[in-house]
């Protein structure tokens, strides 16, 4: 329903090459969402007969423009059967005119007639100088070569001859692909190995009048004619990889700076490609040298960065693009007065905390030592849970318990007084006799029933409210049968407002699973996630919830799923926290979730049974944890109390965008005729998967159908019973 807006386009453009690793609808959409400005198709690895379907697939998933990058005037190894061959040093091999399968003694070059241009004595370096051969003879079938420096040679890899060879600026494949691009109304084209102005004019003749031509500078000839090429082009692209075949590596930084300066002087855009994040082809994070190189490239004045192999064949295309986006954002953000000052909020691609800042309110050592001198107010366990979540930022932007004006604003407008969307009153009820012992301006110690202090409150207001009016606006009823209303009236009509500081967390038997918002954000960032689905639950996993989780992952193309069970106060008959966590840990241990896609972390919270208000509230809590999406079940947060799914959606739609996308699911059922899961209302053959029924099966010691709950999960729960551990709150 509520789409997280695309990340703002950066002034510095990001170009991504699509290939086997990224030619997938969901990956394309993710790259689009990250702010990629141009998708590159490398025609050196694309045949004309495949191009139309490739363009169609890309355009069906994004509106981002496509750039056809030509093969150009270059020599490459042939398309071997194997991915690579090995040429042994001092061996004699044949470079064929015709296509051959490729082995240690026979291979071919591309284009096929290039061998006619070779001369005896030519030195030929292959695959970025890893192999060096020399032409020693010419025969009808091809050229005879002696291997001076042996090694592995990949198929379709770059070849350099030690003298200039005149080649057509466009191959036959290029010309066929340009015709398809023209037919498909593509507007961006890159000319590889541009050597002179005539080359640029040639590609303009074969494309649209208003085509955006990017000329690639990757040879000494191109460098010599840089001004003429730039004059005829819309932009330049420095391909540092191919350029380094003719320019010594130690001179590449100097040459890069000179090209960028010339382009700027001529008012031409200039992009930089090759080896930006080479290590991330296999590793999830870059090297420090790569990060430093990118920053210096931006300092040089580059208008854009091009990801090539990193996103085309690398193992982490989204992580690569995310890293570049973070670096660009860091470069473009306002500079600190002191560059050595570390910013409070590092660059993150995760959804921004609600209100723009993750609240952190932990008492200092000195403040903790002073709590014994404070007036003590004994409060409920749920109030202490609120203190903990306020302090760790789960309720950001709240810094404490609401005053009268803020509560009224939330109940009347679903917004805080500053206009920020917020739907849940967060109140601290205090008996009149207790409230009379302190006043506005005092600092009060908030203690549990055991007398232990867990938080402090800086009192800003003490006020009363009409509980029936509050209940009607909050829960849409004043019935004491509603558990939320009952809790409200039990606390009384006197409330205390003020900022909170956490002194100590409540004891927990599941602390090892609990993650604060800062911790969950750290984990997501460490995994390279920026699009995360949150799932909040009070129950062990069953097939219905599993279907929702996997379907949401598939439909949204999210990087990962954050399963966030609640582990604190429950109603009689609810599942205990232990069995819930055990069921999910069993799924993870047995590899039943997609590998690397799921994080399990619990939250100390409680239900308020506030229907659509609570849906939005729990969504905002997940947003603060770093989730961009949030799954809503039809029985979410106790909506069986006085609320219907339709009214929930109407309420949520009335709020507008609040920065997290909700993914709604109706009750999931299993179709016995097709063995498929889907909405329970879809077919008469659908059998609804119901939490209440699962509880009944477990209480009665009956086996649950496999289609309702996995057998391994059932076994884990039955093992708890066998250990005399209770599954339910009694």
Please tell me what each predicted stretch does.
Residues 2-344:
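Non-catalytic helical/linker scaffolds that mediate oligomerization, partner binding
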Residues 345-730:
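Active-site cores that bind ATP or allylic diphosphates and position pyrophosphate for catalysis
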């Amino acid at each position: 329903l509520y789409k997280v807006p695309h990340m703002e386009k950066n002034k510095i453009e990001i170009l991504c090459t699509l290939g086997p690793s990224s030619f997938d609808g969901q990956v394309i959409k993710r790259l689009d969402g990250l702010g990629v400005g141009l998708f590159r198709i490398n025609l050196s690895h694309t045949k004309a007969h495949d191009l139309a379907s490739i363009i169609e697939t890309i355009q069906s998933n994004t509106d981002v423009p496509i750039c056809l990058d030509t093969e150009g005037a270059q020599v490459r190894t042939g398309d071997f059967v194997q991915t690579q061959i090995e040429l042994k040093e001092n061996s004699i091999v044949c470079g064929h005119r015709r296509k051959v399968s490729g082995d240690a003694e026979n291979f071919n070059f591309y284009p096929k007639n290039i061998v006619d241009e070779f001369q005896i004595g030519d030195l030929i370096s292959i695959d970025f100088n890893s192999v060096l051969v020399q032409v020693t003879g010419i025969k009808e079938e091809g050229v005879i070569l002696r291997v001076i420096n042996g090694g592995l040679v990949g198929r379709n890899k770059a070849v350099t001859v030690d003298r200039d060879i005149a080649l057509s600026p466009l191959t036959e494949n290029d010309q066929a692909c340009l015709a398809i691009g023209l037919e498909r109304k593509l507007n961006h084209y890159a000319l590889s190995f541009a050597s002179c102005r005539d080359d640029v004019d040639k590609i303009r003749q074969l494309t649209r009048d208003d085509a955006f031509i990017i000329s690639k500078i990757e040879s000494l000839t191109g460098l010599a004619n840089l001004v003429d090429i730039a004059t005829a082009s819309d932009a330049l692209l420095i391909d540092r990889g191919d350029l380094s075949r003719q320019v010594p590596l130690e001179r590449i930084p100097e040459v890069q700076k000179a090209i960028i300066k010339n382009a700027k002087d001529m008012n031409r855009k200039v992009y930089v490609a090759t080896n930006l994040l080479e290590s991330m082809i296999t590793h999830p994070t870059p090297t420090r040298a790569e990060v430093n190189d990118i920053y210096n490239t931006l300092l040089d004045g580059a208008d854009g960065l091009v990801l090539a192999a990193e996103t085309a064949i690398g193992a982490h295309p989204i992580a690569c693009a995310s890293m570049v986006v973070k670096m660009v954002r860091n470069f473009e953000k306002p500079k600190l007065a002191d560059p050595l000052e570390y910013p409070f909020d590092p660059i993150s691609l995760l959804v921004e905390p609600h209100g723009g800042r993750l609240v952190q309110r932990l008492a200092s050592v000195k403040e903790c030592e002073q709590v014994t001198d404070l007036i003590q107010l004994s409060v409920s366990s749920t109030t202490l849970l609120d203190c903990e979540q306020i302090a760790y930022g789960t309720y950001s932007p709240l810094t404490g318990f609401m005053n009268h004006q803020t509560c009224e604003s939330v109940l009347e407008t679903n917004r805080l007084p500053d206009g920020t969307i917020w739907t849940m009153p967060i109140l601290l009820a205090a008996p009149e006799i207790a409230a009379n012992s302190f006043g506005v301006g005092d600092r009060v110690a908030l203690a549990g029933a055991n007398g232990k202090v867990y938080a402090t409150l800086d009192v800003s207001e003490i006020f009363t409210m009409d509980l029936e009016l509050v209940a009607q606006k909050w829960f849409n009823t004043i019935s004491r049968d509603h558990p939320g209303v009952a809790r409200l009236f039990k606390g009384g009509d006197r409330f205390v407002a003020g900022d909170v500081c956490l002194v100590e967390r409540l004891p927990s038997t599941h602390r090892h699973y609990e993650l604060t918002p800062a911790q969950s954000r750290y984990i997501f960032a460490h995994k390279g996630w920026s699009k995360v689905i949150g799932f909040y639950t009070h129950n062990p996993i069953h097939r219905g919830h599993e279907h929702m989780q996997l379907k949401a992952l598939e439909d949204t193309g999210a990087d990962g799923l954050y399963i966030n069970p609640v582990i604190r106060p429950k109603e009689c008959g609810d599942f205990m926290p232990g069995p819930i966590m055990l069921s999910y840990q069993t799924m993870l241990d047995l590899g039943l979730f997609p590998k690397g896609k799921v994080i399990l972390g619990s939250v100390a919270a409680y239900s308020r049974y506030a229907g659509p208000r609570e849906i939005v509230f729990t969504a905002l809590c997940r947003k603060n944890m770093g989730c961009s999406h949030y799954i809503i079940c039809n029985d979410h947060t106790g909506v069986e109390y006085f609320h219907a799914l339709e009214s929930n959606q109407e309420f949520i739609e009335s709020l507008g965008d609040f920065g997290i996308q909700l993914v709604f699911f109706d009750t999931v059922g299993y179709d016995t005729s097709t063995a498929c899961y889907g909405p329970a209302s879809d077919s008469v053959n659908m059998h609804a998967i119901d939490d209440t029924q699962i509880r009944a099966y477990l209480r009665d010691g009956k086996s649950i159908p496999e289609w309702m709950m996995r057998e391994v999960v059932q076994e884990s729960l039955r093992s708890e019973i066998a250990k005399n551990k209770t599954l339910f709150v009694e």
